[in-house]
Structures are given as C-alpha cells and as structure tokens.
Design a protein with these regions (language model features):
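Acidic interaction surfaces
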Residues: 1-266
Length: 266
C-alpha cells in the first residue's frame, strides 16, 4: 500500500482485489481470439482451434461459397507440398499463406503469452521458447478501421493508427493479467470522503491518472506517496486524524452559546 498525508487528508493507494477483464467492461476496437489449454484468454468465441479460426477468416475474405472452399483447399495443398521439406514447418507456411489473404480484408496482430510466475501478453515475441508462445491474434476489419478513424480507403497511416489502438488494448489486457489494477481512498480527518477503483497499468502512470480524480488541493499528494506495509501505522494515522476532528468538534461545542445547545437538543 502507498500512503501520503497532507494536512487533514490521508491518501491511500492499493491493489484492487476485484479484477474485471477490460474485455468485459470496455468497448473495444479489436477482437482478441486466443487458444490455450488451461486459460480462457481474450474475447469469448466459438472456434475449435486456431486452424478453424484462420479457415473461417480466410473464407470470410474470399467468400463462403463453393469457389471459396475450392480456393482454400487448393491453397492448402499447394503450400503444403512446397514447404513439406523446407525451413518453415508445413503448418506455419499454411498459416502465413492464409494470413496474407486475410490481410486483404483485416488488420491482424499476433498475441504472445508469457506464462512464468504469472501471465503477461504482448504483440511481439517474448523470445522465450520455454515459457512463452503465440496464443492467438487481435484483429479488426479494414471497414471498421475506416469508420473509426475516417477515410475512404486504407492507407499506411490509418493502418498504423489501427495497429497502435489494438496494441493499447493488448497493453490494458496485459495489465489485467499481471494484476496491475489499483484504487485509491481519500480520508479527511479520518473519515472516508472519496474513493475510485479500476485504474490499470504501471503504478507510476496510474498515480498520475488518479490525480485527475482527486479534489483540488489534493492532486499533488500522488507525488508524495510512500510505501506503507504496517497496518498499525495506517490505523494510527487515521485515528490521529479522527482525533483532530473530535477535538475540533469539542472546541466548537465549547464556544457555542448555551441557549443554542439547548435549542438544538430540543
């Protein structure tokens, strides 16, 4: 837990124990399709495996008809025969060939998972064949990308915007997988006055975001947060502020005219 004290205020920043996937609560631009034997990752889908997914995306690009099926079967046979004894595996060669066709209609990025003392995800390889590997893709149709950013045809600049937005969504999901989710509680004179949860990302960046939700006069408290792991110290700080509040109330009571006190009591 991080804590900062300034005047009558005490700000506490701590992990959010109720983690909700950003894929469930946020509107997202890209669609994340993942396949893993132990974890349910990304967005929900009905594909049996990655081959089923790529096949459907391929047919969606060339056409879900007899001609499309024949083109698919012909492509698989040709690529398989060419790369059966080449440097690429036959499976990878077929995947690459399908993705090349799929790219005519969709913008895709690969998704890699690191599974070592926790989970992490990104769109580039972790270069760790033992504990990481590709688990799927995030994609968006070019049509939806044009609607999002405006424009009549896909350009390199628009493609980059689409890819960057999908990368940002993967980064948010990565924070969720890592458990990088936080919230704050703001106390005044020992009494909770404000709180907000669900901030995701690197803690330093999260604290800057939290400042936007704090009242004026408290925003700079995020710059003075310090690690505080002793519950007794935290409780002592809150009790100290509560005592100040009680003392202030007592002094106000002492200076209140007796007639007013009696009237208030009635």
């Amino acid at each position: 837990m991080l804590m900062a004290v300034e005047g009558p205020y005490a700000l506490m920043v701590q992990p959010d124990d109720i983690l909700i996937s950003p894929r469930e609560v946020d509107e997202h631009f890209g669609t994340m399709v993942c396949f893993h034997s132990r974890y349910a990752l990304g967005d929900s889908h009905n594909y049996m495996d990655k081959d089923d997914f790529l096949r459907e995306m391929y047919l969606d690009t060339v056409g879900h008809d007899e001609a499309g099926l024949k083109r698919y079967e012909h492509m698989v046979n040709i690529v398989s025969s060419r790369f059966r004894h080449g440097p690429k595996t036959e499976e990878q060669a077929v995947d690459d060939a399908m993705l090349k066709v799929i790219s005519e209609k969709y913008i895709t990025l690969p998704l890699y998972l690191m599974d070592h003392s926790g989970l992490a995800m990104q769109t580039t390889s972790f270069n760790d064949p033992w504990d990481s590997g590709q688990v799927g893709w995030i994609y968006v149709s070019k049509e939806d990308a044009l609607k999002e950013f405006g424009g009549e045809k896909m350009t390199g600049a628009l493609r980059k915007k689409a890819e960057d937005l999908m990368r940002s969504e993967v980064a948010a999901y990565d924070s969720y997988l890592r458990g990088e989710c936080y919230g704050f509680e703001l106390y005044k004179n020992g009494e909770l006055t404000d709180s907000c949860w669900g901030f995701m990302g690197d803690l330093a960046d999260v604290c800057k975001d939290m400042a936007e939700y704090l009242p004026e006069g408290c925003k700079d408290m995020v710059d003075h947060l310090e690690e505080q792991d002793h519950p007794a110290t935290i409780i002592k700080t809150l009790l100290k502020h509560a005592k100040i509040q009680v003392n202030q109330a007592a002094k106000a009571f002492e200076h209140t005219p007796r007639q007013q006190v009696i009237g208030d009591a009635r």
